C-alpha cells in the first residue's frame, strides 16, 4: 500500500511538472509570436527618440511575421535581406526600402541610394552615378518622410493585437530607440 502511494505521488509530481513546463512553453510561444506579429503596431505607440523610426525598423526586421497584404504595386522580398518595393505612384520609378549591411537602405525615384545605420541615422548617400553626396545637402527628415510614404500602405493595415503587450514590447525595445 505504501509503494502505491509513492507511485501515485511520483506520477502527480511528474504530471504537475510536465503541465507547468507545457504551460510555460505555450505562454512563451504565444508572447513571442504576439510581439513579432504586432511589432509595427507596438512600435508606432512606443515612446522613442526623434528620428529613430522604430515602426519602419520593425516593419523590415519582422517582415516575415507581420501582416503583409497583397497590394498592387507593392512587392515584398524576404528570401535574404528583407526589402519592400513600391511602384504605385505614376512616376514609373519604384522606391524600395530594406535591410542592408547592418542597417537599412532606401532607393528613391531618382535612383539616389541612402544608407541608414541600425539606429536609423543617415550614414551615406550615392547618386545614380554612384558618386557620394554630401550629407549636409540632404534633408534627412524629407527622406524619412518619403520612406514612410513608400511603406504607408503596409503601415496603415497593421491591426490592434488581441492581447496588448505594449508594456513588454517597450521593456524589450525602448533602450534601442532612445
What kind of feature is each model-predicted range?
Residues 5-28:
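Hydrophobic membrane-insertion alpha-helices, especially the h-region
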Residues 17, 34, 54-57, 133, ...:
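Intrinsic-disorder/low-complexity peptide segments enriched for small residues
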Amino acid at each position: 500500500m505504501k509503494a502505491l502511494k509513492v507511485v501515485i505521488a511520483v506520477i502527480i509530481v511528474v504530471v504537475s511538472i510536465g503541465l507547468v513546463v507545457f504551460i510555460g512553453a505555450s505562454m512563451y510561444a504565444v508572447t513571442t509570436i504576439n510581439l513579432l506579429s504586432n511589432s509595427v503596431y507596438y512600435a508606432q505607440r512606443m515612446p522613442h527618440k526623434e528620428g529613430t523610426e522604430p515602426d519602419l525598423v520593425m516593419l523590415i526586421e519582422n517582415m516575415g511575421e507581420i501582416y503583409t497584404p497583397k497590394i498592387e504595386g507593392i512587392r515584398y522580398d524576404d528570401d535574404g535581406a528583407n526589402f519592400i518595393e513600391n511602384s504605385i505612384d505614376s512616376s514609373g520609378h519604384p522606391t524600395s526600402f530594406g535591410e542592408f549591411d547592418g542597417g537599412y537602405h532606401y532607393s528613391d525615384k531618382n535612383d539616389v541610394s541612402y544608407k541608414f545605420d541600425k539606429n536609423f541615422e543617415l550614414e551615406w548617400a550615392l547618386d545614380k552615378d554612384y558618386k557620394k553626396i554630401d550629407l549636409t545637402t540632404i534633408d534627412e527628415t524629407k527622406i524619412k518622410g518619403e520612406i514612410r510614404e513608400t511603406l504607408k500602405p503596409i503601415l496603415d493595415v497593421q491591426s490592434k493585437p488581441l492581447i496588448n503587450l505594449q508594456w513588454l514590447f517597450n521593456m524589450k525595445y525602448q533602450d534601442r530607440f532612445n
